[in-house]
Design a protein with these regions (language model features):
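Predominantly soluble domains enriched in secretory-pathway, periplasmic, or organellar proteins
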Residues: 1-102
Length: 102
């Protein structure tokens, strides 16, 4: 799967910027409060080829660099169904994203 980025500064004429590789089933995403990291849930459907069951971490400040992947419980038969950052966890989410990059 891919994440497609658009420039929406002119909403009536969105401009395609780039496609960033994620994983099979790239679906929901959430932006960190500082707008640096994009977390992408990769589980569109629980079907072969439609669900990697991971979360891709993308650094938008570095031109859409894929930092890595967060493993979920796919091996145990679970897939993420939605993704969100909780208010009290913003700092921890940014910290974890920066650790994935190391």
């Amino acid at each position: 799967g891919f994440v497609n980025l658009y420039d929406n500064s002119d909403p009536s004429h969105p401009r395609f910027l780039q496609a960033i590789p994620a994983a099979q089933g790239a679906h929901h995403s959430v932006l960190s409060p500082d707008e640096r990291y994009l977390f992408v849930q990769n589980s569109l459907l629980n079907l072969e080829g439609m669900s990697d069951g991971s979360i891709t971490v993308i650094d938008l400040a570095k031109g859409g660099t894929v930092l890595g992947s967060i493993d979920t419980l796919k091996a145990q038969g679970f897939n993420p169904n939605c993704i969100m950052l909780l208010p009290n966890h913003f700092r921890q989410a940014n910290l974890r994203a920066s650790l994935v990059a190391k």
